[in-house]
Amino acid sequence: MELGRTRNVHIVGIGGAGMSAIAELLLKSGFSVSGSDLASGEVIDKLRELGAVVWQGHEAEHVGMSDVVVYSSAVRPESNVEIQAAEKQGIPVIKRDEMLGELMRYKVGICVSGTHGKTTTTAMIATMLLESGQSPTVMIGGVSDYLKGSTVVGEGRHMVIEADEYDRAFLKLTPTIAVVNSLESEHMDTYGTMDNLRDSFAAFANKVPFYGRVICCVDWPEIRSLISRLNRRYTTFGIEEPADVMASDLEACEGGSVFTVEAFGESYPGVRLGVPGRHNVLNALAAFSVGLEIGLPPEKIIAGLGAYTGMRRRFQMKFKGGNGLLVVDDYAHHPSEVKATVKAARHGWKEHRIVAVFQPHLYSRTSEFAVEFGWALSRADAIYVAGIYPSRERTEDFPGVTGELVAEAARKAGAKEVTFEPDSEQLLDSLRQEAGPDTLILFMGAGDITHLATRFASMCADEGTATGAAG
């Protein structure tokens, strides 16, 4: 593997999941790697064992004789002394995604994009490859217990990447196979208009080489429109719309699904998926399509999908009690994701009372989608809306925007039991009253609601609400 005359790479924020994987790949490819991070730990220790020089803290002299400096989205270049020093010395400074795109040129790059389903589909493909005896390099924006983390640096020819559309990062990647899982309004703080978002997805899909393939879900109207803009070979998949790869005879069962895959005129019955929800069947169809494209035998694809055990924060079972009490944690933070997650709970556990606990993420998203969130939540038996998790936004910039907007929208959508509770301790007290037999308490959101889910699961275990274990 060569990057011109570049031999010495310095990585700012080298301890992050995505950055450490790039560092490991560079080290195993013969590059000299240095880096810095504010934290230390096992990841840093491992990189040092592989030969990296890593400093704790940022200093201008760390840049040294580097040929290029790479930084992550978590680093602010305008205030980082190492990046400023590199720029003064005329050393190229690039984002993580640009380096990743260059490294992908030496692999068969499988990039999974979409408004929803990226993390799960990427993990399904990775599991499928590993179960088939392959040794892929994998980078996922979530934590997989099967993969023992979010990254794998393999020796094989495939590189499986979660391609994030935020800030147009995925346009720096160089996919051989581009998966477009879903497409609807999201990240308008980056794109401004839907036309700009559509243009970026079209540009991403058309980045595949003439011998590559685009794999797209035609159940999404925006993707059906996108197909007319493709100038590359493509495979379609879906459940509702006619497609090259489809699911039929779909049966939802507690904790998963069983279905038949119809692909290019062939039928593959008895496909079992150990994660619930129709949306996960679509994710599995994307992975199945990728498997066929890279030449995996169908029986190995099916076995790989059956081995998929889920991701942390993707319908993650945190507590399972002997009396039927379940506590689930999910990353859903867009109306479509919330709707799909509530639906998965409703279909998978038909006899359970479904209690949805939702923390809105970002003031801007809450303001834009309050009505849609209300409708998405309304199929739950009881709804609790927590305070908004601001992330990168400031409260004072969004006067009057609170979780009550979502709660009121849910009431207008017909929900009977709706509570807005911004106080975490009060919310926990209320949920303790909900923790009865055959009840599924579903925590959703991209913010710190996950910590509340963990606390509540521990409370259920400690208080002996039912015989079971917190996960």
Curated annotation (Swiss-Prot):
Task: Spell out the SUPFAM superfamilies in the cross-references.
Answer: MurCD N-terminal domain, MurD-like peptide ligases, catalytic domain, MurD-like peptide ligases, peptide-binding domain
Pathway(s) per entry: Cell wall biogenesis; peptidoglycan biosynthesis
Q: Which residues cross the membrane?
A: none
Report the top EC class in one word.
Answer: ligase
Subcellular compartments: Cytoplasm
Q: Which UniProt keywords apply?
A: ATP-binding, Cell cycle, Cell division, Cell shape, Cell wall biogenesis/degradation, Cytoplasm, Ligase, Nucleotide-binding, Peptidoglycan synthesis
Offer a single GO CC term for the protein.
cytoplasm
Q: What is this protein called?
A: UDP-N-acetylmuramate--L-alanine ligase
Q: Which organism is it from?
A: Chlorobaculum parvum (strain DSM 263 / NCIMB 8327)
Q: What is the lineage of its organism?
A: Bacteria, Pseudomonadati, Chlorobiota, Chlorobiia, Chlorobiales
